[in-house]
Amino acid sequence: MSMKTKNQTTLVLSILAAFVLIFSSCKKTDSFRNSGKYSTVASRAIKDVEVIISSSGANFQSVMLDVQKVEIKEDLNGSNDDNDNFADADDNMDDHLKTVDDYGQWKSVGQSPKLIDMASLKNGIESLIGDATAMYQVRKIRITLGTNNYVIDNAGETHPLRLENDVEKVIYIRLHQDDIDEELALNQQKFHLYFDATNSIKLDNGIYTLDPIVRPFSIKAFGELTGQVFPEDVNAFVKIDDGMGNTIFAYADKDGGFKVRGLKEGNNYTVTFEASGYVTQKLNSVIMEKGKKTELNAVTLIQ
C-alpha cells in the first residue's frame, strides 16, 4: 500500500471515529434531556424565570433599597435533581469568591440597577427585580445592594441605612421545591421573595442600620391572610405569630385593609392588631392552609 493510500485510509477512519463519538454523545444528551428528571423543579427545556419581591411594609414613609444586581445559581449537575436539599451545604461565604463551584454557576437575571421603595410593596403589591431564561435547576438567588440605601421617616426626614460590612450588602436566598411556583405548560418559573422590613431595620444611637432578612415563598405551598381594620385611618399594625416563635408583620392601608402572603401551614396562628391610642385586640387559633386564602372577619378597634 502506498503512503498516499495509507494517509487516505487513516483520514477516513478518523472521520468515521469522530462521527461515531458525536452521534453517541448526542444520543446520551437527548436521552438525559428526555428522562424527566427535571419535571419536578426545572426541566431541560429553556424556562422563563422571574424574581419578584414584596415586603411587610414598615413604619416609614419610604424604605429605599439600592438594588445593583440580581443573580440565580443554576445547578449544572443533573445527577442531583432528585435531592431537594443538595445545595443546603453550599457556603454563602464561598460564593463571594467565585462564580462557579460544585453546586452550580451564577447567572445574572437582573435588570438595570434601581432604587426600590420597599415600604410601598405591601399588602400584595410586588415588584419584578429580575427576569431571564434558565435551563437548569435554580438553587439560590443573590441580590447585591449598593450604598445608596435610606429611609424617610414619618416626619419627612431622610436617614441613610448603614450596612455593617460588605458581606451584608449581598443577600443570599436558598431555594427548595416548595419555594418555586412553576407552570410546566408555559415553561415558566416564578420566585417570590418577602423582605421583612420591620426586622431588617434597626435604630441604634440615632443610626439606622440594615441587616436584610429576605425569605422565599410560593403561592402553591404557602397561605395568604387578609383582613380589614376599623377605623380605617388609624394606621393599624398587624402582628402574625405562627405559634412556633416566628412573627410576620403587616401595616394596614389607608382603607384599613391588609394582606400577607407566604405564611406556612398551621392551625395555631395568633393575629394581633395595634394602633396608637387604641386597645390591642387578638385573634387566636387562626388556621392557615397551603395554597389557600384565609379571610378574617373585620376587626374594630376601640379607644
Regions found by a protein language model. Give the residues of each.
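C-terminal motif of bacterial Sec signal peptides marking the signal peptidase cleavage site
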Residues: 22-25
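A short, solvent-exposed, low-complexity linear motif enriched for acidic/polar residues
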Residues: 27-254, 259-266, 270, 275-279, ...
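Bacterial N-terminal signal peptides that target proteins for export
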Residues: 2-15
